[in-house]
Amino acid sequence: MRNPIIDVGAKELSYEIREIVDVAKKIEEFGINITWENIGDPVAKGEKIPDWIKDIIAEIVKNDCSYAYCPTKGLLETREFLAEQVNKRGGVQITAEDIIFFNGLGDAIAKIYGLLKRQVRVINPSPSYSTHSSAEASHAGSPPVTYFLDPYNYWYPDIDDLEKRIKYNPAVSGILVINPDNPTGAVYPKKILNEIVDLANEYDLFIICDEIYCNLVYNGKKQHLLCEVIDDVCGLSLKGISKELPWPGARCGWIEIYNADKDEEFKKYVESIYKAKLIEVCSTTLPQMAIPRIMGHRNYKKYLEERNRFFEKRSNTAYKKLKDLDGVIANKANGAFYMSVVFEDNYLNGNNSIKIENEKLKEFIEHQIKDASIDKKFVYYLLASTGICVVPLTSFCSQLNGFRVTLLERDDEKFEWIFDTLAEKIDEFLKT
């Protein structure tokens, strides 16, 4: 090309959750059946959408308006419905004008980070959902700035570590919180959220809280939303329907803007997000039309309770299978539908492996992992020997070696097999 055309931030873009699929497809050619535990798509894992939800959507499809553009921020009726849900919680109060729809939260995340001044940093949790960490690092053109989630303390944020990293890095202007958390399944107590808000207030920061899993909370944990604790701090809550209905293929998410009137700089920032959406015209109309009718339906609360009971059962089974393994730190997931497992360092020697029967497949895998992290080696050995596809924990912006696995499998017998096999192969890997 006449000139260099690649932005310096492009090197920071990574999404192992999908990238591993290419390797898995190659492994399928060796006759291995793949069990996909790498991505959080409940529908792909066999979850059935209730008929009453399908009936609502089918009726909307017959309405010609569902094929038209909608207002740039989203349908007014839907935004009013969602604003009312926030206001019922008694914390910060918003209007429909404080909500903007996007084509999935991936779209929202790209704009949220992409419209920040390049020198500004948003500190991410570690581990962190890779869409956030990659987008933030790409915007800045340098690796993510992170704070530690402690696997020895239920994956809760280390607040002292967070404060130090804010205090000694003046570029940090925002804090990312993911609650319930992906990839760990942690659900944060109100006390921790209050402490994060206090830090944001003290250092004059804004908060981004990804709450896409906010209605997937179980094991007796209580849901606490940012809107309940944010007080006068500026913030954005990210929500959507991909995981909750679930309707991931709709690509429908939104941001709720809190306290934009409290800071002129933050107000201009959210105005820039809106203007970026103006250029795109709007987000998809049909799923927006469905939201009030589905979430306001008499069956919806019961439906959420049923889903949470299912994931609670899965969480407890998975934890029981893995918690007593030597060399493993396992925490019970209490929200979302993922579990993250950590390998203790003193069990890792650089030569850990899992036996692969097919010599040609073994040769292929060992070529793939020649310079890989230890946990990526585990993931690829596991994939080749069993067909189970999980994601290395280091791909979630973490220094910890381990993996993330979903709790989505609907078939009880197969779910038991997945976690029995994981336990067996973890033991083999850590003892070689």
Curated annotation (Swiss-Prot):
Belongs to the class-II pyridoxal-phosphate-dependent aminotransferase family. It is found in: Cytoplasm. Keywords: Aminotransferase, Cytoplasm, Pyridoxal phosphate, Transferase. The modification N6-(pyridoxal phosphate)lysine is found at residue 243. It is an enzyme of class 2 (transferase). InterPro entries: Ala_Aminotransferase, Aminotransferase_I/II_large, PyrdxlP-dep_Trfase, PyrdxlP-dep_Trfase_major, PyrdxlP-dep_Trfase_small. GO terms for cellular component: cytoplasm. Coiled coil: none annotated. It comes from the Archaea. One of its GO terms (molecular function) is transaminase activity. One of its GO terms (biological process) is biosynthetic process. This is Uncharacterized aminotransferase MJ1479. Its main location: cytoplasm. CDD domains: AAT_like. It holds the Pfam family Aminotran_1_2. PANTHER family: GLUTAMATE-PYRUVATE AMINOTRANSFERASE ALAA. The lineage of its organism: Archaea, Methanobacteriati, Methanobacteriota, Methanomada group, Methanococci. Its cofactor is pyridoxal 5'-phosphate. Its EC number is 2.6.1.-. Disulfide bonds: none annotated.
